[in-house]
Amino acid sequence: MKPDNQAGVKHKGAAKTARIPIKIVPLDEKLKKPEWIRAKLPNGQRFHEIKQILREQKLHTVCEEATCPNIGECFSKGTATFMIMGDICTRRCPFCDVGHGRPNPLDENEPRHLAESVAAMRLKYVVVTSVDRDDLRDGGAQHFADCINAVREMSPATQIETLVPDFRGRLDIAVDILTQTPPDVMNHNLETVPRLYKQARPGADYAHSLQLLKDYKAKNPNVRTKSGLMVGLGETDEEILEVMRDLRAHNVDMLTIGQYLQPSDGHLPVLRYVHPDVFKMFEEKAYEMGFVHAAVGAMVRSSYHADVQAHEAGV
């Protein structure tokens, strides 16, 4: 049996969140899911085709690793969000179901495997995300660039969206590297309001994440920038609106807001289910603030219908 701190050992659920600075306090009684929280069950031939291609190419998707509720619908439509640089994250965010631990070294063949999969799946739009890699000097920025180059070479008509980590401590070098091979959309999720960062995003910094989005836009004015938020962690509506204002002040073009759903009892509990009328209010406010596109609703995730979001934003 491998020691807990050995490279490649993945911790999930309570094993992952046991050492976060603010401990998870479970509710005496879980909130009942309202009737508007519904996802389609995984099914169909296309769903299984996608899974087979991913396994053959030894690729990971955030759809599977983060236990996304929309996996059935997306896979059945032939869309997937690829997760590069392994399936082990160096952070312990207690809202996220991706495993934590010491990651394995980067796979130098991954960009080629990714490009081959995109071609095999005949994808017109692809989202590429990653785990956090605080162990790498550039946070993995060059690996992102290599993946973009490989996909562009094999599928030149395919549009690419990157959903990047925060590259904390490596912002300037990461922005420089990612400017050399720009995607069509650059996404970095703020996830929650600044008051809840220490609890929900240990290791991250709200101002740093905003700066990453602003600096990238400054160097790549023709690339749409995008960010996403969850609701249900204990934030107020006004705090969400304030984050939206901050995003616009940092020149972010596109917005997603969705309902947080607890992946397991070892994760942060859901403290409220936001009513569809409130989501509608957020959407209306987003357009009033000047967002080019806003995807807002209970089942919205940052990569859900990402192609539709991008095309409606003029990409």
Swiss-Prot record:
Enzyme nomenclature, EC number: 2.8.1.8
Localization per Swiss-Prot or TrEMBL: Cytoplasm
Cofactor note: Binds 2 [4Fe-4S] clusters per subunit. One cluster is coordinated with 3 cysteines and an exchangeable S-adenosyl-L-methionine.
Claim: Signal is one of the keywords in the record: no
Radical SAM core domain span: 75-292
CDD domains: Radical_SAM
Entry annotated with the keyword S-adenosyl-L-methionine: yes
Record pathway: Protein modification; protein lipoylation via endogenous pathway; protein N(6)-(lipoyl)lysine from octanoyl-[acyl-carrier-protein]: step 2/2
SMART domains xref list: Elp3 (SM00729)
Broad class of where this protein is predominantly found: cytoplasm
Cellular component aspect of the GO annotation: cytoplasm
Gene Ontology molecular function, alphabetical: 4 iron, 4 sulfur cluster binding; lipoate synthase activity; metal ion binding
Amino-acid positions noted as binding [4Fe-4S] cluster 2 in the UniProt annotation, renumbered to this chain: C89, C93, C96
Annotated positions binding [4Fe-4S] cluster 1: C63, C68, C74, S303
Pfam families reported in the protein's UniProt record: LIAS_N, Radical_SAM
Cofactor or coenzyme needed: [4Fe-4S] cluster
Catalytic activity: [[Fe-S] cluster scaffold protein carrying a second [4Fe-4S](2+) cluster] + N(6)-octanoyl-L-lysyl-[protein] + 2 oxidized [2Fe-2S]-[ferredoxin] + 2 S-adenosyl-L-methionine + 4 H(+) = [[Fe-S] cluster scaffold protein] + N(6)-[(R)-dihydrolipoyl]-L-lysyl-[protein] + 4 Fe(3+) + 2 hydrogen sulfide + 2 5'-deoxyadenosine + 2 L-methionine + 2 reduced [2Fe-2S]-[ferredoxin]
InterPro entries documented for this protein: Aldolase_TIM, Elp3/MiaA/NifB-like_rSAM, LIAS_N, Lipoyl_synth, rSAM
Keywords: 4Fe-4S, Cytoplasm, Iron, Iron-sulfur, Metal-binding, S-adenosyl-L-methionine, Transferase
PANTHER family the record matches: LIPOYL SYNTHASE (PTHR10949), LIPOYL SYNTHASE, MITOCHONDRIAL (PTHR10949:SF0)
UniProt cross-references to NCBIfam families, sorted A to Z: lipA, PRK05481.1, PRK12928.1
Homology family: Belongs to the radical SAM superfamily. Lipoyl synthase family.
Protein name: Lipoyl synthase
Organism: Chromobacterium violaceum (strain ATCC 12472 / DSM 30191 / JCM 1249 / CCUG 213 / NBRC 12614 / NCIMB 9131 / NCTC 9757 / MK)
